[in-house]
Amino acid sequence: LPGGQLKSELGFNTSLNLEAQTLAVSDLVLKALGLQLEGQLNGTAVLGDAAFDGEIRIGEFNPREVIQALGQPVPEVSDPEVLSRAEAALQLAATKDSVSLSNIQLKLDDSTVKGELKVANFAKPAIRFGLHLDQIDVDRYLPPQSEQPPVPHTTAAAAGAQMIPVETLRALDVDGELTIDQLKAAQLRSS
């Protein structure tokens, strides 16, 4: 953070019942870095094996402004109009061992991702997901043509071995599906 400080505002209403071991946080509003997060959270068995559920919404914001507020350079992209609009909404459920995000709706510029994501057993995570992307033009997010470094000539196998940590990937427990309605990359379209 530039200057090592973050200016923020936080507001919420809360109700804690120790006898029933319940927690309710409503009207949650957090403002920082040009973002406004809103939501609510409910908890049960808060003094034991706590479980929480709730929803989170981040209203429309400008990602470029957030990146700059964090003191980071905005990535150089081919289309100066991208990274200008984003918003998010989701429902969550969590325990000490798992988290589940459902009704995910993430928007970035003209693209929307919807779906769900679950992580069970944090000690050895099992990740499950189902995500749907309506459309994306990857070319718009790439560096301008003149700034792309030249690609060295290597075999496909050698290039793949350098880029993908295969042994690390083999140890992962990930199962999911990503569907894309319309994809444009390298000036090619797929639907």
Residue spans for each PLM region:
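Membrane-proximal interfacial segments on either side of biological membranes
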Residues: 1-7, 11-28, 33-100, 109-191
